[in-house]
Amino acid sequence: MKKNFLKTIMVLGALTLYLFPAYGQSPEKMSYQAVIRNSSDQLVTDQLVGMQISILQGSASGTAVYVETQTPTTNANGLVSIEIGSGTIVSGSFADIDWANGPYFIETETDPTGGTNYTITGTSQLLSV
């Protein structure tokens, strides 16, 4: 009797694993770091900076599928660490990006004074690790 019970439990467990497979999920956030410099190429340290991050599809000048803004504070080395996907959304939805339909590029715009007078500071292709 115990033997049949154990077999039944094992079969049910196997069926559960077979019928309900785990699916991979796209990330809802992405870590990003940058060193912020002003127009005189001096480090911007220990102050709020304005940032606008865009995810572009197709090329470095492609269509913006997601845009957000953030106002992080730089550290003593001018470094900011942010999570893309947790800022103030300007357009698009980070969760709705179809990562299989790339390539995708990240465009970073900054305002070292903490405002919204952004200038493009870089565009680079997003690559998996």
Indicate where each model-derived feature is located.
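Family-positioned intrinsically disordered, low-complexity linker/tail segments enriched in G/S/T/P
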Residues: 2-129
